[in-house]
Amino acid sequence: MLPDRILPAETARERALLATAELWRKVGYEGLTAAAICSRAGIEAEEFEAACGDVEAAAKAAIEVPLAAVVRVVSELYSPDRSEAESYALAIVRILELMAANPAYTFLVYVAGRQMAPPRVHAVYHSGHQFLVAMLERLWASSQLRDQPTRTGLAALGAAEAVVRREILAGRYERLPGLAPDFVYGAMSPFLGQREALRLADLGRRQLQREPAN
């Protein structure tokens, strides 16, 4: 695990959101209470109310934490010195490292927020999912493939998410970064073809071998 991939939990709000994620993972959404969140976060009820409002607002904000981190990763790794696909390949590595370092938040995004959340909270998961699909679909702009079927991004992302959920439910968070080369290949090949996808998968593999990853 890379320490700099751990999301911060220093302010009262950050501690409350991490506590929300950890408790949600442990007891489910229906088991969340403001008192339990405050106890786990080490904050007073007044601090929780000022920082988060109520339990549903805290749950919504907790899912937004890792999604915002993903957006930051994609933005940080964009560079005019490399192709969009290369930036995406590096982003996949970084995102998987983030997921491994933040298991409670990862569980929310890939399991709880998808299946066990009220509509307002589930909508956050859906918006994050749509962002990733749209990101992949942008690869068509640089594709040389003649056949460009619809919903390709959705299919590619769905396949990767199924593998991620399997590893999460088995408690194998530490294995997630090692999946990066396969995920890069699976995400890129429908858009860019096998040869380019293999090159990008190798880029992801080489990035994984760097300590720390950039």
How would you label these PLM feature ranges?
Residues 23-61:
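Helix-turn-helix
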Residues 70-71, 108-109, 160:
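Short, structured motif recognition centered on aromatic/hydrophobic residues
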Residues 1, 134, 138, 169-214:
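C-terminal peripheral helix-coil segments that are non-catalytic and often amphipathic
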Residues 118-142, 150-162, 177-185:
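Amphipathic alpha-helical packing segments from all-alpha helical-bundle domains
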Residues 9-20, 37, 58, 62-70:
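Generic hydrophobic, amphipathic alpha-helix propensity
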Residues 57, 61, 72-104:
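Hydrophobic alpha-helical connector segments
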Residues 18, 85-100, 154, 158, ...:
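Amphipathic alpha-helical segments that line or abut small-molecule/effector binding pockets
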Residues 87, 99-119, 133-137, 165:
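Amphipathic alpha-helical segments used for helix-helix packing
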